[in-house]
């Protein structure tokens, strides 16, 4: 499906930081008896902002054709918050988006009253504070296939491209 891989040379120190981030996530998950509890979930919408703390995320098996049962992905955070009655949401399946010829993923279309429109909508990132924004956590893996371990934070934010 026209996949491109890029390789970037990084320092040993950077690799050690990435490894430590993963080790911290494993430790956090173990300390929570195998549950994924995200210390900070942030939602910055067009009209509303939310900050939830210590959110337990459970598997919803949205992509059962892709993953084994009970694999937890980033989108499960939104589904778990909705299940807890803390927000409402809509998901939308996209075969493609704009010039991205092949997407085939669910996207968060709406959180409460903030609904995607035109070239504006929600994107997300998850990981350690050390790699916030474009330092590594913000990537282009759809949230329904981004497997999470136990990130320090997960953020959905509104963007117009």
Regions found by a protein language model. Give the residues of each.
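Ubiquitin-like/PB1-type beta-grasp interaction modules and other compact soluble beta-rich domains
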Residues: 1-161
């Amino acid at each position: 499906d026209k996949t491109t891989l890029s390789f970037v040379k990084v320092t040993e120190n950077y690799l050690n930081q990435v490894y430590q981030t993963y080790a911290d996530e494993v430790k956090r998950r173990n300390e929570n008896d195998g549950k994924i509890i995200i210390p900070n979930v942030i939602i910055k919408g067009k009209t509303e902002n939310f900050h939830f703390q210590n959110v337990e995320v459970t598997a919803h098996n949205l992509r059962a054709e892709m993953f084994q049962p009970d694999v937890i992905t980033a989108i499960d955070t939104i589904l778990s918050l909705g299940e807890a009655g803390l927000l409402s949401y809509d998901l939308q399946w996209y075969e493609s988006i704009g010039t991205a010829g092949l997407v085939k993923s669910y996207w968060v279309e709406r959180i409460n009253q903030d609904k995607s429109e035109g070239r504006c909508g929600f994107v997300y990132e998850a990981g350690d504070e050390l790699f916030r924004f474009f330092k590594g956590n913000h990537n282009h893996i759809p949230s329904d296939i981004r497997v999470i371990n136990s990130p320090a934070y997960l953020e959905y934010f509104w963007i117009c491209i």
